[in-house]
């Protein structure tokens, strides 16, 4: 029997190596390894379509191999944000699927956001069980980069559909999701796929203190997600008397890959989606990439125009310049380790109860 510490450590190491060898024989190579054998590399991400939100997420977008939840009130931009993620994935040559449990996907609107609808795989399942089985098959194929489920509230259990209208089905949906997510978590990671759940908000009954809002589907989704995004409409964008879009705020209420509680603000324009040009102007001016003198904006001593809308029109017509400015902004975010993410009201966010 070994008595000195070095011999004891050697014996332990031999025993561990033997155990690892047996595990690899039983479950295949890669089932277990030391961390140094698989060094932590830069997280592979897909952009959200918003520069500010990519920065607020801390890693430059949504991380692959993770489960994401986007939740918020009605007409706040949840589906719009998810469709932008699909469009960005398709730009990289990725394959995407949309599980339309609400049976409400607007194909024409999706095209306007840049989604290649001809290449988009779509399913309109009849029950929640069917939806989760379809997702499992798609994930296990390892061919799909992004899967969006719209929405959790519409994942109706089979027993509820087959039952009578007035029947009580307490906790059925929560159990369905809990069981489904247990199976999906590991396969999503292995397939390096982003699984996005769109969720709705409900009010808790009888809550006097604290936040009365909660999301549908029980608590399982809150635990299994790596990122939870709370999206809200905070104002209207007007062109004279006509409302042309919404000012939108997204709070990163949970983040397992970077510091949470950051927030991003951007515009969602009707029939256009996230206004990337608006972000380029606002963030570019804030970071000094664009020079602003009064209402005039300049870039590299070239005057872009007077007023935000005129500059947007100029950048729309000169896409190369817009792309160059965007690249400089993203490089600045990377170099500053994302510390300049839009984090207004950070202290207030930390005090709020995160459900």
UniProtKB/Swiss-Prot annotation:
Gene3D superfamilies: P-loop containing nucleotide triphosphate hydrolases (3.40.50.300). One of its GO terms (cellular component) is cytosol. It is found in: Cytoplasm. NCBIfam families: tigrfam_recA. One of its GO terms (molecular function) is single-stranded DNA binding. HAMAP family: RecA (MF_00268). This is Protein RecA. The keyword DNA repair applies. ATP binds at residues 72-79.
């Amino acid at each position: 029997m070994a008595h000195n510490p070095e011999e004891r450590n050697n014996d332990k190491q031999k025993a561990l190596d033997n155990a690892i060898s047996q595990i690899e024989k039983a479950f295949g190579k890669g089932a277990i390894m030391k961390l140094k054998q698989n060094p932590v590399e830069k997280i592979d991400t897909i952009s959200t379509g918003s520069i500010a939100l990519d920065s607020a997420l801390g890693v430059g977008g949504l991380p692959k191999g993770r489960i994401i939840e986007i939740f918020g009130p009605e007409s706040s931009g949840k589906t719009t944000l998810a469709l932008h993620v699909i469009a960005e994935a398709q730009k990289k040559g990725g394959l995407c699927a949309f599980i339309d449990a609400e049976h409400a996907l607007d194909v024409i609107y999706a095209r306007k956001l840049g989604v290649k609808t001809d290449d988009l795989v779509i399913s309109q399942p009849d029950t929640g069980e069917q939806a989760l089985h379809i997702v499992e098959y798609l994930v296990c194929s390892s061919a799909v980069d992004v899967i969006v489920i719209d929405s959790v509230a519409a994942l109706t259990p089979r027993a509820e559909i087959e039952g009578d209208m007035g029947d009580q089905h307490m906790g059925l949906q929560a159990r369905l999701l809990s069981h489904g997510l247990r199976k999906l978590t590991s396969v999503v990671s292995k397939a390096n796929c982003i699984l996005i759940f769109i969720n709705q908000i409900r009010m808790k009954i009888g809550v006097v203190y604290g936040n009365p809002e909660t999301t549908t589907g029980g608590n399982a989704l809150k635990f299994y997600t790596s990122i939870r995004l709370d999206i809200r409409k905070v104002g209207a964008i007007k062109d004279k008397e006509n409302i042309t879009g919404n000012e939108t705020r997204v709070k990163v209420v949970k983040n397992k890959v970077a510091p949470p509680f950051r927030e991003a603000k951007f515009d969602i324009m009707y029939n256009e989606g996230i206004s990337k040009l608006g972000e380029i102007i606002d963030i570019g001016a804030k970071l000094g990439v664009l020079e602003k003198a009064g209402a005039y904006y300049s870039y590299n001593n070239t005057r872009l125009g007077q007023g935000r809308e005129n500059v947007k029109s100029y950048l729309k017509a000169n896409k190369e310049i817009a792309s160059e400015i965007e690249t400089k902004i993203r490089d600045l975010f990377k170099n500053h380790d994302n510390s300049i993410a839009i984090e207004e009201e950070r202290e207030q966010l930390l005090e709020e109860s995160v459900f």
